[in-house]
Amino acid sequence: MIRGGDIAKGTVLLNKGTPYLVVEREFVNPGKGAAFARVKMKNLRDGSVLMQTIKTADTVEDAVVDTHKCQYQYKDGDQFMFMDTESFESISVPAETIGDKEHYLREGDEYDILIWENEPIDVRIPTKMIFIVEQSENYIKGDTVSGATKPIVTETGLVVRVPLFIKQGEKILVNTETNEYQERVNS
């Protein structure tokens, strides 16, 4: 059990026997009445989103989740294959669980996989990742106004808007939570 005031982003809670990942938490302390937390949670089984208000003094059930450090191997149909780096066991994660994170997966990279009741329920992607620009349009300097961007495609198929000076073959840092370009990376 966890107190409502102790709930943080990334916590996995149980709601009616289903695991939910806390994606946002806003603490509210009204002038009158008890403090509470407004929590936005993602259902880890079907991806639906639930908004819930929890008083800070109330307790909610937290899910007992194991975290396994795994290396991404390959995609086989609608399954993504990972290898546990400690036990060397294969872990198959369904495409529904991966969702829109597919383009952040790179063969050989390590990710944390959350396991609940012997079932993978989430793959944690690092907040920032470096990608190589595979496809990029070339623009002539002075062609547009300042602050202009263009779409590029990375080696994983991820599409990101970047400044016009980014060229094919360069490395860029991407914020995976917002899918936004952060900076060019010098190798």
From Swiss-Prot:
- Keyword Zinc annotated: no
GO annotation, biological process: peptide biosynthetic process
Localization, per the record, is: Cytoplasm
Q: What are the alphabetically sorted keywords of the record?
A: Cytoplasm, Elongation factor, Protein biosynthesis
Q: Which GO terms describe its cellular component?
A: cytoplasm
| Signal peptide range | none
> Under which pathway is this protein filed?
Protein biosynthesis; polypeptide chain elongation
Q: Name one Pfam family in it.
A: EFP_N
Q: Which domain of life is it from?
A: Bacteria
- InterPro entries associated with the record: Elong-fact-P_C (IPR015365), NA-bd_OB-fold (IPR012340), Rib_uL2_dom2 (IPR014722), Transl_elong_fac_P/YeiP (IPR020599), Transl_elong_KOW-like (IPR013185), Transl_elong_P/YeiP_cen (IPR001059), Transl_elongation_fac_P (IPR011768), Translation_prot_SH3-like_sf (IPR008991)
Extract the GO molecular function terms from the UniProt entry: translation elongation factor activity
Q: Does the keyword Protein biosynthesis apply?
A: yes
| Function recorded in the entry | Involved in peptide bond synthesis. Stimulates efficient translation and peptide-bond synthesis on native or reconstituted 70S ribosomes in vitro. Probably functions indirectly by altering the affinity of the ribosome for aminoacyl-tRNA, thus increasing their reactivity as acceptors for peptidyl transferase.
Family classification? Belongs to the elongation factor P family.
Protein name per the record: Elongation factor P
